[in-house]
Amino acid sequence: MILITDIISSPVGHALLQLLLSQKEHEPVRVMVTPYDRLSHEDGFEPVVSSFYDLPSLDRALKGVNTLLISTFNLFTDCRCGYLNLLHEAVAEGVKRIIFISSAGRGDSVSLPMQENRETEMHIQQSGIPYAVFRVNILMENLPFFIGTEQGIYYPAGNGRVWFVSVHDVAEAILPFVTGRFGVENRAYTLSHEITYSFDDIAAKLSQYYSGRVKYESVDLAFYRKTLLRMDIPEDTVDRLCSVAKAIS
């Protein structure tokens, strides 16, 4: 049994689920969902209502699981306490291996999501369960989170450059580890791209698809923060988004 922790907010989790279900023969798949997710067994997998903060529900989700795929998207939320609960229950239920979707970046990065993922990697190592960690760079599919939908990019990235990757390429690289075709060797792998893009480059690319020129303006970080707060985004989420912007710049 394979347990995927998130397919709703996680593009990687969703893409991996689709790849698993596309195979003629695959291990049974279970997915953690909330009571509000409209998913059923008819979708080809077993949805289980569970929360990182409800230990009995974690026990049910992990029952009979061999492979735990931690795919939860932590850009907006600190998941560390929930991950600790998950790891504790995974050890108790005899999970055989863990696949963790982490984030790429330097060890001294100011990005809060990346710092938290590094801490979680350490806890996974200490769990004693064989693991593979995949440090994924920013997904090109997540660009709207950073640049919005207007015909102008106003983001405090300066001249920073990013190795954007496609979620489909990432999922295909991870799939053999999830299915067991490749063994896990208690290693961390970085999934990135050989070409970097600045936000100026992105604006130039987008300009090819619009009638007018798409402009990039590197706004002040304080202005960006105030703008997000005016949108009624919770302050702790704003702090996370600002830390990512600062890391890119």
Language-model-detected regions and their locations in the chain:
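Rossmann-fold cofactor-recognition segment
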Residues: 43-54
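C-terminal helical cap and adjacent loop that interface with cofactors, partners, or active-site loops
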Residues: 249
